[in-house]
């Protein structure tokens, strides 16, 4: 597992298919469900601009013990309609600090969030989470208003994960 240097990026406003799952391991369930839904619409992640993002989303919610809520956004073209389980909504985009991780599942990829937070505080970059030190930020990670996004993708047969921390 390797971390890149942190960089400032802007994610564009985009139309997204939105879905969330609450369970002990919600990431695989949420991503699998939406990726299958996309395939049924003739769309595949990584093709024709379709990108997938996920984030924890449990702040202020009553979640059963041992569970987490994970929310996913997948960018979609304007002509896609949702259904009872998938909402189509606007993602506002914005400014983010981005850390890319090569081969993220070969190590402790969540430690990348600490790298991003340390970079933001060391460089006096305002994060949009509302935390005042790296140590108190983790409780702010999980809301839809200022999501800390994870994006998995492949490049030349290698897997990567980009972590996005919302900043001013």
What are these model-predicted stretches?
Residues 1-168:
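A solvent-exposed interaction/effector surface
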